Structure formats: C-alpha cells, structure tokens
C-alpha cells in the first residue's frame, strides 16, 4: 500500500493535523495529539505511515479521537532537527518515528514523551534503546529487520554460477551498515567476492552503479532510505548491463528491482499502531516493552524486471507475490 504525498496531506486533514505550538499536550476538543515524522517519501515508509494510522484506528483511535501532526523531512537532516524541536515544544501525547534517522533525531531531542518507531532495522545498535528486549528509554516499536542472508541467497537462486556480489548503500545510515556487514559476512561464507559502494545522497547513485558494471554478477541493496527513494535511477544502469538487483524492502521491488524477501511495511506499521494504542491506553510503557519483530514477511518478484534481464523465475518463487 503506497501513501502518496497528496494522500498524506488528506490524511493529515482528516485526522485534524495542527501545529499547536503552545506546549499544550491536548487540543481543545480533547483529542489525543499524535506526532508523526518520516525521513523522506518512498513506498515502504509511506506504507508504514498509513499502516500506523490504520493500526491506531483498529484500536479505537480514529479521526474522532486523535489529532495527527504529519511531518516529512524530505531526506534533509537539518529538517529532522527542526521537526524534533517542533515536537518538543508541542508536547504531543505520542510520537511515531518512521525510519532510523527520524527516530534518532526525535530521541536525541526528547526524553520524556513516548516514541514508537517503525521501519528501523536495529533499535539497540542505533542507540535508541539500552537493549531490544528491555529498552529502558522512552522508545520502543517494531523493527524491519529482514533475513539478509536469504535476501542475498535470492541472487544465487537466479544466478547459481554467480561469483561477485555488489553492495550499494548510504554511508550515513546505521541501519544500512548493519545489513551490509551481515551481507558481507554471508557472502564470505559462500565464497563470493564483494564489491562495495557507498553513497551520500541520491546524486551519487548513478555513478556508483556505473562503477559496478562489469565488476559484479548481481547487486544487493539493504533497507536503505536513500537508495529506496531512487531505485529507478539504479536499475536504469543495471538493467541494460543485465545485472539483477535484490533488495531488502518491498517497495524497491515494486519500483524496479528484481526481487525481495521483505517485511510487509504496511502491516509492520499496523503493528506499531497497535503498540501506540496500548501506550495511550496505559497498558504498556516504552521503557519496559520489548522491541517487536515484524509479524509478516513476503517474497516479491518483479516479473517485468525478470523479463528485461532474461531470467527465468526459480520454481520455489513461482507462488511469490508478482509485481511489475
């Protein structure tokens, strides 16, 4: 499920989005104030955002009970700091942080309001919690950690003779580094040579991809926000070179990568929404509520990409969700 910019705006209006800056915790109509921050717009994060709101609604927190302040940093770290300061001043009842950078920004600024995170690979490594099983902070939520090893293995299912794995990810995202390290360790165990490229912004993706042509047999991209927002740029280089791309997020496969074994980000958002409702109901506290694993994983294959690359879909993926 993809939440477009227009849909996000409509959702904000539907839920009574407002910029209360007076430090009041609730609006005058008694609704709970929910603040949502998303690092940038791309399919997986948009789906998590919509899922979060739907999860709240399922637990009784619909438009009649909550006022939602939706903020999107558009990939700019300085915007995240401004948004965090806004939330600190407005003091909402609960904050939802979508992505690791968004969660780090609000958690660094705010220590006394509950924060529910989603689309975050590892809360503990990102220093959002003391441990994933016992946070001891004002942050908890749902991680988006998929099975990196099996995601890499997808490449070998399509290309059994492959010897060279390409890795491309953002140098500024700790979530991506975690997964890249896992991928490199797994590649070493399989005897694969790894060619690694990092980017600092979407402007670096084309050059990084071009430098891999002729050097790799297939590429793996983790759940990286920078790359996820520009998959068409990546496959514009890799498709003509007949280099398949396997990814950590469902939206990346929908946008042109060949395949993914991924968290369902919409359902993960719903799961986070349920946790948020439990916080609002006083049933749980963030500091003693373990970070949850995603409940749903799915295999996604882009049929158009497979056809473009001239690759047959392996038998074990015949029942996968087909897109493209």
Where are these regions (language model features)?
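Bacterial lipoprotein signal-peptidase II cleavage site
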Residues: 16-28
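Beta-alpha junction/loop-to-helix N-cap segments that form part of ligand/metal-binding clefts
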Residues: 69-130, 221-239, 243, 248
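Hydrophobic alpha-helical segments within soluble ligand-binding/sensing domains
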Residues: 123-164, 264-284
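An alpha-beta-alpha
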Residues: 34-36, 52, 140-187, 289-305
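Hinge/cleft segment of the Venus flytrap/periplasmic-binding protein
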Residues: 278-324
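Pocket-lining segment of extracytoplasmic ligand-binding domains
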Residues: 174-243, 249
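Sec-dependent bacterial lipoprotein signal peptides
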Residues: 1-15
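Extracytoplasmic "Venus flytrap"
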Residues: 29-53, 59, 69-78, 172-173, ...
């Amino acid at each position: 499920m993809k939440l477009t910019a227009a849909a996000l705006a409509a959702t904000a209006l539907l839920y009574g989005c407002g910029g209360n800056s007076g430090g009041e915790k609730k609006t005058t109509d008694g609704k709970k104030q929910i603040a949502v921050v998303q690092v940038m717009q791309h399919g997986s994060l948009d789906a998590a955002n919509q899922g979060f709101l739907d999860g709240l609604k399922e637990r009784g927190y619909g438009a009649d009970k909550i006022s939602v302040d939706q903020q999107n940093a558009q990939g700019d770290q300085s915007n995240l700091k401004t948004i965090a300061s806004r939330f600190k001043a407005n003091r909402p009842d609960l904050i939802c942080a979508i992505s690791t950078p968004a969660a780090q920004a609000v958690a660094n600024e705010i220590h006394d309001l509950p924060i529910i995170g989603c689309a975050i690979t590892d809360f503990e490594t990102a220093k959002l919690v003391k441990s994933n099983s016992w946070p001891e902070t004002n942050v908890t939520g749902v991680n988006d950690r998929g099975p990196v090893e099996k995601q890499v293995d997808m490449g070998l299912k399509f290309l059994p003779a492959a010897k060279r794995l390409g890795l491309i990810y953002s140098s500024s995202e700790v979530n991506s580094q975690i997964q890249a390290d896992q991928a490199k360790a797994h590649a070493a165990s399989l005897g694969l040579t790894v060619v690694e490229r990092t980017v600092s912004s979407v402007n670096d993706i084309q050059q990084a991809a071009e430098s891999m042509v002729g050097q790799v047999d297939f590429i793996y991209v983790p759940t990286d926000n920078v790359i996820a927002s520009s998959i068409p740029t990546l496959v514009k280089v890799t498709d003509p070179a007949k280099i398949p791309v396997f990814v950590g997020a469902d939206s990346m496969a929908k946008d042109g990568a060949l395949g993914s074994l991924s968290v369902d980000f919409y359902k993960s958002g719903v799961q986070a929404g349920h946790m948020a409702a439990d916080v609002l109901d006083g049933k749980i506290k963030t500091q003693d509520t373990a970070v949850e694993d995603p409940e749903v994983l799915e295999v996604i294959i882009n049929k158009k990409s497979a056809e473009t690359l001239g690759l047959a879909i392996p038998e074990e993926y015949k029942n996968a969700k087909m897109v493209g």
